[in-house]
Curated annotation (Swiss-Prot):
Reactions it catalyzes: dTDP-alpha-D-glucose = dTDP-4-dehydro-6-deoxy-alpha-D-glucose + H2O
Name this polypeptide is given: Putative dTDP-D-glucose 4,6-dehydratase
Species of the source: Acanthamoeba polyphaga mimivirus
Family recorded in the similarity comment: Belongs to the NAD(P)-dependent epimerase/dehydratase family. dTDP-glucose dehydratase subfamily.
Source superkingdom: Viruses
Pfam families referenced in this protein's UniProt entry, alphabetically: GDP_Man_Dehyd
First-level EC class: lyase
Stored Gene3D superfamilies: NAD(P)-binding Rossmann-like Domain, UDP-galactose 4-epimerase, domain 1
Residues reported to bind substrate: 124
Length: 323
């Protein structure tokens, strides 16, 4: 790994990965490829002389080919995607165009380029679909996505895997829990609740608020991706998951405690999603076999730190109605 292209590198998970790699390796050139969408920010990246920004769309075949050849890219780490489930119900075609077609463009450019050592594709645990309270999803489990976002991620995975089987393109796929941490645009649950509390607004609870998610810190994800890139087996898929399951109401309670306000006074119940998976639960023994361990285990402590971070840094995001 000498010249690495990180798609979506101005976004949430992408920027955390860029900052991790930049601080850990002093001999890696990082090319941040990003369209600069509403949820991205140049302030998310800790820039230095080894990190360079290329503004572009992953559907732009010519620009991707030029970037690969001009910078002698040996590794692609593909984070770029539309990822907000609520938006996928409203504009599903845009999700297909970027998440499926955009990924296909990257793969075809990689095949034609012919010098790539690794194409890493970040996916989500949502591709497994909803499971009950006793089940877990392994890497070989059936994919059964239930919303347009998850369906596009599953579709992209199938194309990625086909390029490994058909063209021997060196690929690795990872599926991740719900990620939280710095640099996340406040449309997702945790930063949205934090910013609402900071602005004195109600916390909007979809449905009953009883749906559950496992939350993993972005720093743990960056470390896991780094490990998989360097030690993972080509052609394999790895779950990146933890046991840190909380309901939406649990998260609201923790954040209200941090803000020093009464939970019941802050809640406003709104209609649920068209389909809202109750829970996901993935195994992590495969990635643990590579030596990965979760480091950010104290969820409440991390949320206190994150609350303070958004107090100072939410200005970088154009949040409607924010003070």
């Amino acid at each position: 790994m000498k010249n690495i292209l990180v798609t979506g590198g101005l976004g949430f998970i992408g920027s955390n990965f860029v900052n991790h790699i930049s601080s850990k390796y002093d001999n890696v050139n990082i090319y941040v490829y990003d369209i600069g969408d509403y949820c991205a920010s140049v302030e998310n990246v800790e820039w230095n002389n080894r990190t360079k920004l290329i503004k572009g769309d992953i559907r732009n075949f010519d620009l991707i080919m030029h970037t690969l050849t001009e910078h002698e890219i040996d590794t692609i780490v593909h984070f770029a995607a539309h990822s907000h489930v609520d938006n996928s119900f409203k504009n599903s075609l845009a999700f297909t165009e970027t998440n499926v077609f955009g990924t296909h463009v990257l793969l075809e450019c990689s095949r034609m380029y012919g010098k790539l050592k690794l194409f890493f594709h970040m996916s989500t645990d949502e591709v497994y679909g909803e499971i009950d309270t006793t089940d877990t999803s392994r890497e070989v489990s059936l994919l059964c996505p239930t919303n347009p976002y998850a369906a596009t991620k599953a579709g992209a995975e199938h194309i990625v895997k086909s390029y490994f089987l058909s063209y021997k393109l060196p690929i690795i796929i990872a599926r991740c829990n719900n990620v939280y941490g710095r640099n996340q645009y406040p449309e997702k649950l945790i930063p949205k609740f934090i910013c609402s509390l900071l602005d004195g607004k109600k916390l909007h609870i979809q449905g009953t608020g009883n749906s559950r998610r496992n939350f993993i810190h972005a720093i743990d994800v960056a470390d896991a991706v780094d490990l998989v890139i360097n030690n993972g087996v080509i052609g394999e898929t790895y779950n990146i998951g933890v046991t840190n399951e909380h309901s939406v109401l649990d998260v609201a309670q923790i954040l209200c405690d941090i803000a020093g306000v009464n939970l019941e006074n802050q809640l406003e119940y709104v209609p649920d999603r068209l389909f809202n998976d109750f829970r996901y639960n993935i195994t992590n023994d495969k990635i643990k076999s590579l030596g990965w361990e979760q480091s950010r285990k104290d969820f409440k402590k991390e949320l206190v730190e994150l609350f303070d971070w958004y107090k100072v840094n939410r200005h970088r995001y154009n949040i409607p109605g924010s003070q």
